[in-house]
Amino acid sequence: MAKKEFKAESKRLLDMMINSIYTQKEIFLRELISNSSDAIDKIYYKALTDDALTFDKDSYYIKVAADKDARTLTISDTGIGMTKDELEQHLGTIAKSGSLAFKKENELKDGHDIIGQFGVGFYAAFMVADVVTVISKALGSEEAYKWESAGADGYTIEPCEKDSVGTDIILKIKENTEDDSYDEFLEEYRLKAIIKKYSDFIRYPIKMDTTINKPKEGSENEFEEVQEEQTVNSMVPIWRKNKSELTDEDYEKFYAEKHYGFDKPLTHVHISVDGAVRYNAILFVPENMPFDYYSKEYEKGLELYSNGVLIMNKCADLLPDHFSFVKGMVDSEDLSLNISREMLQHDRQLKLIAKNISKKIKSELQSLLKKDREKYETFYKSFGRQLKFGVYNDFGANKDQLKDLLLFYSSKEKKLVSLDEYVSRMPEEQKFIYYATGDSYDRIEKLPQTEMVADKGYEILYFTEDIDEFAIKMLASYQEKEFKSVSSGDLGIDTDEDQKQSEEEESKYKDLFEEMKNILSDKVKNVRISKRLKSHPVCLAADGEVTIEMEKILNAMPDSQNVKAEKVLEINPNHEVFQTLQDAFEQDKEKLSLYTNLLYNQALLIEGLPIQDPVEFTNNICKVMV
């Protein structure tokens, strides 16, 4: 029997198929099972137009069987089979897709769609097999044929015996090498795991002889191992079921089965779209933050299926970074896949799906915020920081999408409030949305800078996370109300009369403040009368865009550039200390220097900033005491 050469394109092309197109050897089983599913689909299509042919789904299946002794793995199907000419055309010509040709000839939908389109998946078998044998009997044919190949040097075709219509693919599994173990593809547990991973939702049963323990006949305590044929795959994916048929428990079970998390999902979104791009999706918002969420090891992304076949474990392009906590899957018939079906081409369909998914996630979170505040706050405590990063990142490109999802602790409500809730209860005369920053709510409560704003009866938002102020700076305003730090130079509270009084006081004490500024040198930009202090003697404010809290955060980062806020030392003219400063200015410049440095260091401590010279500070305290 003469060996025939592959028609297309030689040894180099087949080597590329085996060694370059696929990144994981286990993919071979997915490809062969998908081909078997296509073969059964073809009978279904023919039955739609051929009255003499009936299609009883229960009669069709795929069988996977391993023989460790013979070192073979067999994938059988009860599909349409192939004639000698079809074996020649589809297996003798690399990259010739029989499924694609069949689809073009049979433009029928009816809920079915054939998976194969490239004609290269079959050759993935050579990644794990030295010899591949195909025994096939076509529907309506009396003859069966055997196709066999050991790789790029060619193949043979000869008549053979086969009782039933369908195809058997027999792989002679390679021997182990130093780098690769091929034994795993003969192990029952491994084969089942690969089937569950990639082909769990193939619409036909995938059967295997499975080892189970059963009580020995006539004995209650003794067990024996027996082989029992079982269906490995689930077949009907949950996402193709009608939402009205499913319960929360069904979604929770799916979440657990897919190992999306150890917790229960906080909420889920079930999407079915049959428009320009057809797809189904189930998305989950976890209750708890994964332990590695803010580490380099965490991978965002959704599982991506094409016609129920897993293509990617983590398709990052389907989720924006600010929704990277979302788990779940997408299944579509309309995606443009690369030749190995392992990767997506970056196309319009993918972008449309990703855009719609992002809208659905936001809509679900907004609904949760309005209808189940307790559940939303549970979510926010885990993932609110990520939403704030989303506002700040990409130069604020997503800030308008995310701003209504933000929550901050309120000085009045003593709980988390939304920006909309804050603005809705602002007094008419209030011009700004006020905020204060600090390490904790308790610490912010005690900040001297909050006194004036609180005295006016205005609500203050408390920022305790390092991203908070950066996000708000990017947001800039909400419902035409600008954000204003209680530590900013101008609080926007003064009346014309207040402003006039301040200018008079600044002029009156100008010489004192200039002397204090000279004492502190470049530590501060200015020294001035405080319009915000009521009971405290001193505080630091910041002029310019960089606030004192931002200075702390930026300088704590690796490779920091020693960022400095433009600090201003503010003195309360109504505090007893101020008279002491005036007396020292007029009578004892050395004491003025001592008091000025003490007050400056006191202001640093209030802000949580380090004192440059702690020894000098403690010595100065001792000098005052004696």
Swiss-Prot record:
Major location category of this protein: cytoplasm
Subcellular location(s) per record: Cytoplasm
Stretch list, region C: 553-626
A GO biological-process term: DNA damage response
Protein name: Chaperone protein HtpG
Keywords for this protein: ATP-binding, Chaperone, Cytoplasm, Nucleotide-binding, Stress response
Source organism, top-level taxon: Bacteria
Subunit note: Homodimer.
MF GO annotations: ATP binding; ATP hydrolysis activity; ATP-dependent protein folding chaperone; unfolded protein binding
Family to which the UniProt record says this protein belongs: Belongs to the heat shock protein 90 family.
Gene3D superfamilies: 3.30.230.80, 3.40.50.11260, Heat shock protein 90, C-terminal domain (1.20.120.790), Histidine kinase-like ATPase, C-terminal domain (3.30.565.10)
Transmembrane segments: none
Region of interest: A: 1-341
Function (record text): Molecular chaperone. Has ATPase activity.
B, as annotated region: 342-552
Gene Ontology CC terms: cytosol
